[in-house]
Structures are given as structure tokens and as C-alpha cells.
């Protein structure tokens, strides 16, 4: 597959590996999730370039060849959104359209809250906007879902899951990258999906071709999974540091859910009044599972912005 060649972009507080395509002028920044890579948008980049957009697709801090600071706090929401602001500055853009999937969506939502003037419009996949909780979210999940809920585990036992995932990167990613995992309402992923298994009986079907899987495996064998998991270890810090932030998204917004995603859909209309909401018949990895339909929705929505 013809994927753009990366270059290293040196920012104020980090260096990001950035994949770029298209002519300058109409910037659109594509933000990956966990555990992903800029390559997750391989199906969208050529279509967006053909439509006249300048695609800027970073491996965010902790991923690929981008900076991997040692301190957990260096992955908080202010650092992650600050990287995107600095990226716009590096390309000499005042604002851009931002697309986010999974954790990328969380970063884009917060970018719009913390730096609203830099966000022209938002297209997010899988993870909807959620207003700031009234209490520490990790403590809430621990009380409601127990110690084995992955976010709780990542926070309470740092390094344990990463060691297991890094011991067999391809096996771990094979467990994660599956399509329509929750097509059957009774389907569940293993509680501790980071632990080795023969993968027999897992819900859904393998999503990636061998050459596609090889890109992700190579990237995570290089970067490891400790830094990406540090994003999760900042939920409490993010909550503590955003108490005074107004919870409202004023930008035009496209929200795409996967019908069989484990991430629940929510009513965002109070906080995101301009949300245009769609549901595709797929699981969590929306733009990879349903690239044609995702691209159609993106292009129609982008066309309406012009």
C-alpha cells in the first residue's frame, strides 16, 4: 500500500513523526487512538487528498518514532493537546479540521475545549464527548467495574500489562484488531486482554491483512507499549487539571459510532449542539472496518462545511 513517507517535526516540547500528503491550504489533522498508529488512516488519506485537503497525520507522543518521555505526567491532556497546537504552528496554520478515533477522539474533544480557536471542525469516531465527571473517573471505574477493568489495571499496576503485551506484540494486536467483536450481544472480550491466549473463540473476525498487521507490529516492537499506556495513567490528573474548563463544543461536528462497538453511545446534544451523528454496522475500528462508508460520510460532511 502506498502510504506517505514520514518526517520528524520538532515542536516546542516534543518531536513527532508526521505523515503528510496533499497540497497546502486546507489542513485536516488525523489523530489515531490506542493501540494504533498513523497507518490507521491509510484508507482515508488518499480520498481526502483527492478532495483537496492537506492531510497531516502524526504519530502522537509515545507512538512510532515520536518522543517517548519517561514521566507519566508528560502524557496528560495538556501535553497531548499542546502537541497538536504546536503542530499547527509548525505548519503555519491558525486552525484545522481535526479527526480523531478512540483516544484520538478524546484528545480532539479536549483540544476544542482548551484551544477552541485552533479547531475549525471535528469529526470523531467511536468515543463521544463526555462532560467532566464529578469525581475521579479511575476511582469510579474501580468501584463499579473492579480491579481487572483495563483502565484500573493500567493505573494500579503500571508496567504489568505492558510487559505481557510486549512479549508477543502480534498476538496482542491480533486479539485487539478484530471486526464486529460485539455483533452477538453475548460476546465479550477477555477481561485481561493483555494476557496470552490462543485466541480461539474470540468474538469477531481478524480485521487486518498480513502486510497491514506487519506495519503495526513493527511500530510497537520499536516503541513498546509503556508510553501509550501512560495516556490512561493520566485520567485522574486530567480530571484534576480541567475543573474550570467550560464543557461545550461549539464547532461543527461529525460523530460516527460503530453499532457493534463496546464504547457506549451517549446523547451529546446538550454539549455538542452541532453534532451530526451516524452509526455504521461495524465494531470499534470504524475507519478500518468500514473505510468506504466512513469516507462517504466524511466527504459529505466536509462538503457541507464549504
Give the location of each predicted region.
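Conserved beta-strand scaffold positions in the cores of enzyme catalytic domains, especially
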Residues: 6-8, 55-57, 255, 276-279
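A short loop-to-beta-strand scaffold at the N-terminal edge of the catalytic core in hydrolase folds
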Residues: 12-20
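Active-site helix-initiating loop/hinge in glycosyltransferases
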Residues: 33, 76, 289-290
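Hydrophobic residues on the short alpha-helix immediately C-terminal to a glycine-rich phosphate/catalytic loop
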Residues: 44, 111, 297-301
Amino acid at each position: 500500500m502506498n502510504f506517505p513517507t514520514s518526517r520528524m517535526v520538532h515542536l516546542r516540547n516534543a518531536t513527532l513523526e508526521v505523515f503528510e500528503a496533499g497540497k497546502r491550504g486546507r489542513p485536516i489533522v488525523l489523530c489515531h487512538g490506542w493501540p494504533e498508529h498513523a497507518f490507521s488512516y491509510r484508507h482515508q488519506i488518499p480520498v481526502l487528498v483527492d478532495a483537496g485537503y492537506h492531510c497531516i497525520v502524526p504519530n502522537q507522543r509515545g507512538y512510532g518514532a515520536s518522543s517517548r518521555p519517561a514521566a507519566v505526567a508528560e502524557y496528560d491532556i495538556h501535553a497531548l493537546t499542546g502537541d497538536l497546537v504546536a503542530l499547527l504552528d509548525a505548519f503555519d496554520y491558525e486552525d484545522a479540521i481535526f479527526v480523531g478515533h478512540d483516544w484520538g477522539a478524546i484528545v480532539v474533544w479536549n483540544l476544542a475545549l482548551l484551544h477552541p480557536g485552533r479547531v475549525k471542525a471535528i469529526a470523531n469516531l467511536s468515543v463521544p464527548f463526555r462532560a467532566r465527571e464529578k469525581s475521579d473517573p479511575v476511582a469510579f471505574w474501580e468501584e463499579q467495574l473492579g480491579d481487572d477493568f483495563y483502565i484500573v489495571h493500567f493505573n494500579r499496576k503500571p508496567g504489568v500489562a505492558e510487559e505481557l503485551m510486549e512479549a508477543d506484540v502480534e498476538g496482542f494486536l491480533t486479539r485487539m484488531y478484530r471486526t464486529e467483536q460485539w455483533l452477538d450481544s453475548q460476546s465479550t472480550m477477555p477481561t485481561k486482554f493483555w494476557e496470552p491466549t490462543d485466541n480461539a473463540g474470540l468474538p469477531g473476525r481478524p480485521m487486518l491483512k498480513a502486510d497491514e498487521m506487519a506495519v503495526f507490529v513493527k511500530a510497537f516492537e520499536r516503541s513498546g507499549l509503556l508510553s501509550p499506556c501512560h495516556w490512561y495513567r493520566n485520567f485522574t490528573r486530567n480530571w484534576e487539571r480541567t475543573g474550570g474548563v467550560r464543557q461545550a463544543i461549539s464547532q461543527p461536528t461529525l460523530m460516527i459510532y460503530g453499532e457493534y462497538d463496546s464504547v457506549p453511545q451517549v446523547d451529546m446534544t446538550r454539549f455538542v449542539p452541532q453534532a451530526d451523528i451516524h452509526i455504521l454496522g461495524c465494531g470499534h475500528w470504524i475507519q478500518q472496518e468500514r473505510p468506504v462508508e466512513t469516507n462517504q460520510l466524511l466527504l459529505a460532511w466536509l462538503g457541507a462545511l464549504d
